[in-house]
């Protein structure tokens, strides 16, 4: 009987351990970013740039000085222009926005409008975690993770100097993965430097 009770107790302990391991593994999987998937980030590295809140656009309507100006993309992903009002730009390319503005101006405001849109200032990128000066910084073209960390003052004394976690919005969904230091950075990316394990 004592042998049977010990056997039951051992079985219960084993069940509890298995449940704890399974739960811990599941929670760790939720909290930790995915492994480095170069194809995911490489696929978006050379995609046409899409606009979002924080970008500043230079809009030129040729022959219409009152419409040509610099416009900031607001939190709703729109710019506000004279005559045509609010123009949605979130997730669109500058070419898409040129067509949209020209189409609206053609509706009774300007005959055969010629419109040029360019990004005057990109939205910032963010560096968090174990760096000297965490925060947001203005984007510079052809930037890598290494460059971004240097702009943030370099690694902190406890910063892991291998791969970092990079969060990028892809098709409207934030995706986080581990990337090497030579990975390209895009406007709006968030780089998180983890603490190294001693």
What are these regions (language model features)?
Residues 2-6, 17-18, 29-198:
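Ser/Thr/Pro/Gly-biased, low-complexity, turn-/loop-rich segments
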Residues 8-26:
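Sec-dependent N-terminal signal peptides
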């Amino acid at each position: 009987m004592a042998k049977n009770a010990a056997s039951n107790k051992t079985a219960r302990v084993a069940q509890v351990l298995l449940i704890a391991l399974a739960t811990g593994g599941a929670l760790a999987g939720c909290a930790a970013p995915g492994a480095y998937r170069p194809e995911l980030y490489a696929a978006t590295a050379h995609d046409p740039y899409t606009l979002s809140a924080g970008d500043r656009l230079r809009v030129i309507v040729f022959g219409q000085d009152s419409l040509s100006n610099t416009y900031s993309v607001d939190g709703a992903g729109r710019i506000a222009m004279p005559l045509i009002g609010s123009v949605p730009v979130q997730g669109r390319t500058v070419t898409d926005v040129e067509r949209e503005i020209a189409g609206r101006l053609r509706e009774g405001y300007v005959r055969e409008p010629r419109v040029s849109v360019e990004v005057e200032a990109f939205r910032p990128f963010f560096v968090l975690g174990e760096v000297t000066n965490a925060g947001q910084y203005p984007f510079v073209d052809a930037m890598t993770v290494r460059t971004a960390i240097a702009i943030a003052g370099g690694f902190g004394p406890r910063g892991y100097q291998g791969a970092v976690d990079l969060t990028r919005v892809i098709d409207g969904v934030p995706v986080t993965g581990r990337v090497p230091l030579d990975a390209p950075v895009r406007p709006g990316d968030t780089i998180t430097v983890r603490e190294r394990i001693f």
